[in-house]
Amino acid sequence: MNILDPFTGTGTFIVNLLQDEELMPADKLSLKYRDEIWCNEILLLAYYIATINIEYAYHSRVPEKYVPFVGAVLTDTFQMYEEGDSLDLEMFTDNTERILEEMEASIHVIVGNPPYSIGQKDANDNNKNVDYKTLDSRIGDTYAKGSAAGLKKGLYDQYIRAFRWATDRIAERGIVSFVTNGGWLDAQAMDGFRKCLVEEFNSIYVFNLRGNQRTQGEQSRKEGGKIFGSGSRAPIAITMLVKNPASEEHGAIHYHDIGDYLDREMKLAKILLCRMWVAHPPPRALP
């Protein structure tokens, strides 16, 4: 089962995966590390840091012999899949082979924290607004086509592009799990996006962490703390989308709101508690 973080940054998701002995048992670790984990990053410094962090995480559990991590790819994830485009092959010659191997691999799990773009404040932001004709055409044929909103610019935000790209990349079976701006949950312009999620996935899990600081007064206090601290005013949501042809669910929505008036530390504690419950569910009550 191949795993991909298409926007890895400094490798946090992959590092935590490798360090977690429940998610990554010892008998699976070497195979995953060598052959079944991929991550993409467009910034050179972050790419090198991610590689170092991932190698350190692996060797903290398997210290006997140094094994380089070959799943890191220096690339623009969206651009490398554009039809008729050879940008990556020309710009990133040192890892051309890895780009081609990743493109040929069947990807079953995609996880990450996609960048945002709509409303960015600086032209030097990591998430520059770039046109991706093939990807944007897919959005036009799906999310935009199904929308009744007059203004559809938000459907081309980088994180919405990430959902469209990942949905197509896993094909007929797999999991997409992203930590993103939570604005898509109730924004009018996102109606077509929400509709497509129900149509394209068997199961939809959403953990709404709230934190929308673009609100005012009592509503702002109810939204609570910002998960990413002072660096973001947007609400945050954790979303997991499951495609499984054998599932009895079809467009089933499993939604949880973290609650009102919680500061950042309280939210993080609640997230940890939920993770512990998933890993070690309490016994069912006797009848």
Question: Can you annotate each of these PLM segments?
Answer:
Residues 1-205:
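SAM-dependent methyltransferase catalytic region
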